């Protein structure tokens, strides 16, 4: 019997999101996932969600994402949570980056709340 091969659908994400993903990965962000909200919400197209292990790493991930996108001329319209560093939100209109402490991510459960959105796993 022939073995059935599973193929992942190739991901096609906007270049700015790919850049944000790379910047987050450069700072060792954990559990990266993208939610495609185009069919589920009117206020943004995508969420990029990831975690850091401590406040310093969470800020470093946020700084890396902001620096990488600023190099391309993009600045967040809004930044929240930078000082506390339990949940930093970077709003780029078309997509929003959420950087969580693990326990905060579990508590708020964005992936669960937006369960109807297509989930794009980022295995690199």
Regions found by a protein language model. Give the residues of each.
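A short alpha-helix capping/helix-coil boundary motif
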Residues: 1, 43-46
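Long, contiguous binding/interaction regions
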Residues: 1-34, 38-39, 53-60, 67, ...
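Glycine/charge-rich, flexible interdomain linkers and switch-proximal surface loops
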Residues: 31-43, 77-94
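Short glycine-rich or small-residue beta-strand-to-loop segments that form or flank ligand, phosphate
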Residues: 47-51
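Compact, glycine-rich, soluble single-domain proteins
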Residues: 57-74, 89
């Amino acid at each position: 019997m022939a073995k059935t091969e599973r193929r992942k659908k190739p991901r096609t994400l906007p270049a700015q999101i790919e850049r944000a993903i790379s910047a987050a990965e450069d700072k060792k962000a954990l559990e990266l996932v993208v939610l495609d909200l185009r069919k589920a919400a009117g206020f943004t197209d995508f969420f990029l969600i990831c975690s850091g292990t401590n406040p310093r790493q969470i800020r470093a991930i946020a700084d890396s994402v902001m620096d990488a996108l600023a190099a391309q001329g993009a600045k967040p319209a809004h930044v929240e949570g930078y000082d506390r560093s339990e949940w930093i939100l970077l709003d780029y209109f078309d997509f929003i980056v959420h950087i969580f402490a693990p326990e905060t991510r579990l508590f708020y459960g964005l992936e669960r709340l937006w369960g109807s959105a297509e989930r794009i796993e980022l295995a690199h």
